[in-house]
UniProtKB/Swiss-Prot annotation:
Enzyme Commission designation: 5.3.1.1
Residues the record marks as active site: 98, 167
Protein name: Triosephosphate isomerase
A GO biological process held by the record: glyceraldehyde-3-phosphate biosynthetic process
Any one GO CC term of the record: cytosol
Subunit annotation: Homodimer.
Domain of life: Bacteria
SUPFAM superfamilies per UniProt: Triosephosphate isomerase (TIM)
Amino acid sequence: MKKIIIGNWKMNKTVHETRDFIQKFDIFYSKNLGKIKDNLDFAIAPSFTSLALISTSKIDKLKVAAQNLSQFDSGAFTGEISAKMLQDLAVHYVIIGHSERREIFKEIGEDLTNKILQAQKYNLIPVFCVGESLSEFEANETEKVIIGQINEVKSVLNFEKAIIAYEPIWAIGTGKTATAQIAEQVCKLIKNNFGKNIRVIYGGSVNSKNINELLLQKNIDGALVGKASLDPEEFVKILANI
């Protein structure tokens, strides 16, 4: 199964800063071309304002990902961005269910289900995020939480095409990383319960120093990278260290 790396920029980088990133990324990538495996997929999820710029990269393999989408198809929904609009911008992947969306914007199962349906309708690949809080982790409730989150959407999610991203909330942007063994255990849990051929990736303080150990695990098929993906040189190092 192909490994995949997706950079999630969150609410960072202006259009000008994105142009600068792409120029530097192209240079660093070309210099490290011999170190990057041919069977590696990779994408960047910038803010909506910079989506079109990712496609200006000279590196054809770099795909465009979106951080969110509307649960509605079109119409009077001020401020929303539809799946059709994303498709028109050559978006390949879309992140759904990130813990920040669940916690800050109170997205629940019904919202996520509708977003998945919209993504799949327009041939976008959902990157469905699951993860437990620190208190849930310490209470040994990880399995219950992860299985429960996937069960909420399993009736509509096309597991053969979708990606499941395991991101323990306690490891997002904290500098804390689940050990490779913990990440492997949860990714294996997901595959055992929902299908061996599902693409399952890990997210949570991933960088060029820990990416190799993480992806050496049998059931981890890639990574969702946050802060480290904002630096073009570091992002290329991640790709080269797999």
